[in-house]
Amino acid sequence: MKTEKKNINIQIGKRLRTARQNSGYTQEAFAEALDVGVEHYRKLESGIYGLQPEKMLLLYEKYKIDPTYLITGDKNHAFDIELFAFGIGMKWV
């Protein structure tokens, strides 16, 4: 189970890096948007740390980075922010 979670974090981190680079932003900009230090952000991209759903919503809100893409790698769907927020117990306004 621990290995599976680590592999998921690595895959999400790779997609996070790709999305950031494709958007033309620096690690510093994404770290600031997530309210974490640059070193912490680097660990998110490398998969050492897992990206929390609440942080995914912040990236969506600021940069339109699709949380479903980060989780699954699927780019071909309609993302529903309200449903995602509801699923993690947050209210989206």
Predicted features by range, described:
Residues G24-K43, L58, K62:
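Short alpha-helical DNA-recognition segment
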Residues A19, A33, L44, G73:
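Residues in the recognition helix of alpha-helical DNA-binding motifs
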Residues L16, Q27, P53-M56:
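Helix-turn-helix DNA-binding elements, focusing on the entry/boundary residues of the two helices
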Residues E54-Y69:
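DNA major-groove recognition helix of helix-turn-helix/homeodomain DNA-binding modules
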Residues M1-N22:
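A short, Lys/Arg-rich alpha-helix, primarily the initiator
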Residues I12, S23, G37, Q52:
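Flexible coil/turn residues that form the inter-helical turn or adjacent wing/linker of helix-turn-helix
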Residues M1-K2, E61, I71-V93:
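Short, charged recognition helix plus adjacent turn
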